[in-house]
Amino acid sequence: MTEEWSRKTVIGGFGADLAEIVPDKMSGEGSGDLTPELLEAPVMTEAMLASAGIPIIDVPFVTIGGGMGSFVMVDYLRIAGVPTDQIRVLTNIDFPWQTYEYLTRVSQIPDHSRIRSDSSSRPDNIWGFPSYALSEAWQDKSPAHLWHVLIEPLFADYWTPRRSTVFASLGRESKRIGYDKLIARGAVRMVRRRSGGGYFTILTPDAGTSATKRVAYRSRFVHIAVGYPGLRYLPDLQEFREKYQDYEHVVAAYEPHEHVYETLKNRPGTVVIRGGGIVASRVLQRLFDDREKYQLQTNIIHIFRTYIEGKHGPHAWMRRKGSHGWAYQGFNYPKSVWGGQLKARMRKLEGDARGNLYKLMGGTNTPRRRVWQKQMADGRAGDYYRDMQGEVTSVEPGAAGGVVSNVKSRKTGTEQRIESDFIIDCTGLEADISEHRVLNDLLKYTGAGRNPLGRLEVERHFEIKGTANGDGALYAVGAPTLGGYFPGVDTFLGLQIAAQEVADDLARRGWCRKIGPVRSTIQWFKWLTNTPIDR
């Protein structure tokens, strides 16, 4: 079988000898799929792929994931002047904020509501000015947003942007930089070193878009931004769901569960909440809002495994507020991790010392918003909201069709049965990186290792340690790198800081321009006027 394919010029000297290795018309008898030899090869060659009948596409820089991390990286590169034919986004989603939009929606953040992000943390705007607050003030023709930012957090809660504002601005910037032109649809199977330098990224294209089952992207640089490895369930709830095949009464906050709220609108019921982070706060707000709006008789029992009763921390300069089980903090981490003393300190630490500092400043937390405090206080006073500390030893079906949680008190050791109609697991998205196929393959075949928190170990410029190959580099950003030299990786601003570090490293390697003061100023005016980036 003969496959036609076009070979693009690879810049930076990479692949200069390819004309002798791979002809313009590649002939082979392979099926176009991965062979046992390729599956087990830590280093691939053009001849191996040709033998398997897998076509090769040359693009110097590919980013894997297509979500917010990929978008921010592409934004930096386009602003730096990298043309569209030098970048490809390998993804199975339609637009960069698709996954984030889904997760915020199912975790009870509607369009008009506000997300947990700082005013100047704009993934669509690498300069952070104008801020979200200034944009919303202009849009609403009201200075109230600016006044709010001025008096936060002493006299008002932290100002945060509307969900709809974030997505609208992302759509604007995506169109401006020509993001859609860069997308190659499909599922990435693996990234392997290439003999001679660089990498092969094996993509399974969407059905009907390729003559072969697999396509290989030959690149000097690969950027991995795949987000969370998977959805994490509490073990006892996972066991219940699998044993009884009951996915109606025990649900995760990050999966569609609108039926819970609709059922409670039609009859009184009891809901058990598990978890103490921002998602638990959002789910509680939805339950409280519905109870008030529709005059419902919903009862809520909130079970905390770790129960915070007041201020806590190792010393006076590293303490956060807490009460009634909750640990309170405006954002995921103290703000100095994005540009202060904690950021500088973490960059110097290695191994256990770094891991110990993560433990000190990490942990589940949520903002202390006034509306939530009032709702919970009203619930406790009205005896329809109850918080408790305990360890759930097992979950079983209830006699009336609901579920029973057997809870062992952490204080007294006694056990009680709590009957409810639903259990909502709000414990988060974390999962081991080995559960993600691409990340697991990196650990097995490409030399990647784990950091003190068990995630991917990356350099300060986000190159994955142990994966360098010739003049090529393999980068990773976002949640899979938590535990590295920069703590705030899984945030809008964190993704921007990571993208800037990667872009600066690419400039040091001579692959793209560095965004200096003059170029930055010119490009900001282009952003402000929504001028498309040419090429």
Where are these regions (language model features)?
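Flavin (FAD/FMN) cofactor-binding and adjacent substrate-gating region
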Residues: 110-152, 337-350
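Conserved N-terminal glycine-rich FAD pyrophosphate-binding loop of Rossmann-like flavoproteins
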Residues: 92-128, 309-329
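Flavin (primarily FAD) cofactor-binding/catalytic cores of flavoenzymes
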Residues: 2-94, 152-278, 282-535
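Short, solvent-exposed coil/turn linker segments
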Residues: 83, 91, 105, 110-114, ...
